[in-house]
């Protein structure tokens, strides 16, 4: 498909979902899809282990596998009527019989793309075309990333209004040219290195996932540390910033 939120839209339409439980610790990328399809949304908390803090649900449970910290064994133990969002765990295998979605743009330099594993079907005839959205990807090979940041943001915003489409032929072709084993190995090594450096200070008890998305670092004085670095060209990832308002609710 063309994007992760439309993978959810696909499931809503094909399974006729009318009620869904979503984590509070999440960006608003799916809000429009849920509103447009008239889905009742119940929000739930997660713990510091990123597991849902609820004992039952009477609709579908949307599980976000934050930072790849949820094992397939745990996911299977949750039972039926669940949807797994592996947008942050691209290299984790889907579980037979459980609807699972992946997004490609979080891991690879492609302008669109999502993968959905499901046993439900609806006809999707329109194929996305992404050739006109390659500028910010190609430009970074010869210029600085900051020069193309606006194009990157505009591309992300575009999908908020895009209907369900199939993945573009261009993205499909690019994905077939990736050395996935190399990417998985390098990402795993990077996560392990960071965890070795920060394990004692990190308030999170982490597992090292294969092909990690990013390293989540939760420090007791994290807000002060951020202030100290705000005038330095230091990398603060957007995901950490947009979720920060929920951190205190996780305790």
Task: Pin down the residues of each PLM region.
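PLP-dependent aminotransferase-like
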Residues: 2, 6-81, 86-90
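Short beta-strand-to-loop capping motifs
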Residues: 32, 118, 217-221
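Active-site regions of enzymes building and remodeling cell-envelope glycoconjugates
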Residues: 37-42, 58-61, 77-83, 96-103, ...
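Active-site PLP attachment segment
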Residues: 97-139
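Active-site C-terminal subdomain of aminotransferase-like
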Residues: 121-170
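Conserved glycine-rich beta-strand-loop-beta hairpin in the small C-terminal domain of fold type I
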Residues: 166-195, 204-218
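Conserved PLP cofactor-binding pocket of PLP-dependent enzymes
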Residues: 207-218, 222-251
């Amino acid at each position: 498909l063309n994007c992760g939120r439309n993978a959810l839209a696909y499931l809503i339409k094909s399974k006729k979902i009318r009620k869904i439980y979503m984590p509070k610790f999440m960006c608003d990328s799916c809000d429009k899809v849920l509103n447009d399809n008239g889905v009742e949304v119940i929000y739930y908390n997660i713990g510091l282990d990123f597991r849902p803090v609820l004992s039952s649900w009477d609709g579908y449970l949307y599980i976000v596998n934050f930072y790849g910290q949820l094992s397939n064994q745990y996911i299977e133990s949750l039972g039926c009527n669940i949807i797994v969002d592996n947008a942050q765990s691209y290299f984790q295998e889907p579980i037979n019989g459980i609807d699972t979605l992946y997004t490609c743009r979080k891991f690879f330099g492609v302008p669109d793309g999502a993968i959905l594993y499901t046993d439900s079907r609806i006809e999707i005839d329109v194929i996305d075309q992404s050739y006109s959205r390659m500028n910010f990807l190609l430009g970074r090979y010869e210029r600085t990333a900051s020069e193309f940041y606006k194009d990157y943001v505009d591309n992300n915003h575009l999908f908020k209004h895009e209907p369900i489409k199939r993945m573009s032929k261009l993205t499909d072709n690019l994905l077939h040219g990736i050395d996935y084993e190399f990417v998985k190995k390098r990402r795993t090594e990077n996560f392990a290195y960071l965890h070795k450096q920060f394990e004692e200070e990190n308030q999170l008890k982490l597992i090292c996932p294969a092909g990690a998305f990013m390293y989540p670092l939760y420090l007791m004085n994290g807000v002060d540390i951020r202030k100290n670095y705000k005038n330095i060209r230091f990398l603060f990832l957007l995901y950490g910033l947009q979720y920060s308002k929920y951190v205190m609710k996780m305790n």
